[in-house]
UniProtKB/Swiss-Prot annotation:
PANTHER family: GLYCERALDEHYDE-3-PHOSPHATE DEHYDROGENASE 2 (PTHR43148). This is Glyceraldehyde-3-phosphate dehydrogenase 2. Catalyzes the oxidative phosphorylation of glyceraldehyde 3-phosphate (G3P) to 1,3-bisphosphoglycerate (BPG) using the cofactor NAD. The first reaction step involves the formation of a hemiacetal intermediate between G3P and a cysteine residue, and this hemiacetal intermediate is then oxidized to a thioester, with concomitant reduction of NAD to NADH. The reduced NADH is then exchanged with the second NAD, and the thioester is attacked by a nucleophilic inorganic phosphate to produce BPG. Belongs to the glyceraldehyde-3-phosphate dehydrogenase family. It comes from the Bacteria. It is found in: Cytoplasm. Pathway: Carbohydrate degradation; glycolysis; pyruvate from D-glyceraldehyde 3-phosphate: step 1/5. Keywords: Cytoplasm, Glycolysis, NAD, Nucleotide-binding, Oxidoreductase. NAD(+) binds at R12, I13, R78, T120, N184, N313. Homotetramer.
Length: 341
């Protein structure tokens, strides 16, 4: 039995999640809430500058979209509490707007009739469980929580990497820098922004700024609380980012042993190890959370380690959103099956 999902928001992540979810047999995309007409949404799903032409044909219809024989209802209401989730029997509302990332706001989807909510960004508070695949997804709890957060693209990259290093060698402390492609909260030309560096043109400069990844990491890896800190450098590329992680370990290691730990981690689809001398464009539309750049792994004094991990901050992250939605759906189905028996 497939899980009925609705997607709130058709920005970069919302559209990528839709592309992926439409090809997942365990998910049934029932509805989209967006402020644009069907023709605009269909065009932006079919044709994407970064990820290319979609391999399915999405067509606009009256008040909706059609993909083959499958129809998706299109609604437009800025207040999630007014959305027809109960009428449409929505199991999971995926909120990709970034505007309802506090549990007290996301609860509007539950009030509208959705069984669960999945946020495509870090939670800003409230009764929300943050879930990162390959880190704490085995603790996903649909009994205790109605609202879940898939954290950030950077947390999804650094989380599995830090967990492997900590489990195998023990992390004493460390610093991370994410070299991040531009995002739509930056300015194409100089304009006001609460972060004065992000107020500057994203196409002209390397822009130092903050990242919430280290803070979010403690929610999914509490054993590393207080041990990692970091910052971001926004660079003028349209997609694909990397994490530069430097840690002091409890054990002495070699670069080969570090790379082998990632190879043996058993996190297929989450961590990939790349031995070729590649550059960022080569990882565009890579579905993994983290791709270890094996040639860049360094060790100094036996226990100081540098690891470079690439990630497609759009496509890789959106794959994890779909993975978590699928996991929540499977747990809901299992619960309903038990209740019916």
């Amino acid at each position: 039995m497939s899980t009925n999902i609705a997607i709130n928001g058709m920005g970069r992540i919302g559209r990528m999640v839709l592309r992926i979810a439409l090809q997942n047999k365990n998910l049934n995309v029932v509805a989209i809430n967006a402020s644009y007409p069907p023709e605009t949404i269909a065009h932006l799903i079919n044709y994407d500058t970064t990820h290319g032409k979609y391999n399915l044909k999405v067509e606009p219809i009256e008040n909706g979209l059609q993909v083959g024989d499958h129809k998706i209802k299109l609604v437009a209401d800025r207040n999630p509490e007014n959305l027809p989730w109960k009428e449409l029997d929505i199991d999971i509302a995926i909120d990709a707007t970034g505007k309802f990332n506090h549990g007290d706001k996301a609860i509007a989807h539950i009030k509208a009739g959705a069984k669960k909510v999945l946020l495509t960004g870090p939670s800003k508070g409230g009764h929300v469980q943050m879930v990162v695949k390959g880190v704490n997804d085995n603790q996903l709890d649909i009994e205790a929580f109605d609202i879940f957060s898939n954290a950030s693209c950077t947390t999804n990259c650094i989380g599995p990497v830090a967990k492997v290093l900590n489990n195998q060698f023990g992390i004493v402390n460390g610093l991370m820098t994410t070299v991040h492609a531009i995002t739509n909260d930056q300015k194409n030309i100089d304009n006001p922004h609460k972060d004065l560096r992000r107020a500057r043109s994203c196409n002209e400069s390397i822009i130092p700024t903050s990242t919430g990844a280290a803070k979010a990491l403690k929610e999914v890896l509490p054993e590393l609380e207080g041990k990692l800190h970091g910052m971001a450098l926004r660079v003028p590329t349209k997609n694909v980012s990397l994490v530069d992680l430097v840690v002091d370990l409890e054990k002495e290691v070699t670069a080969e042993e570090v790379n082998q730990a990632f190879e043996n981690a058993g996190l297929e689809g989450i961590i990939e190890v790349e031995h070729q001398p590649l550059v960022s464009v080569d990882f565009n539309t890579n579905p993994n959370s983290a791709i270890i750049d094996a040639k860049s792994t360094m060790v100094m004094s036996g226990n100081k380690v540098k690891v470079i991990a690439w990630y497609d901050n759009e496509w890789g992250y959106s794959n994890r959103v779909v993975d978590v939605a699928e996991q929540i759906g499977a747990l809901l189905t299992s619960k309903e099956t038990v209740s019916a028996s």
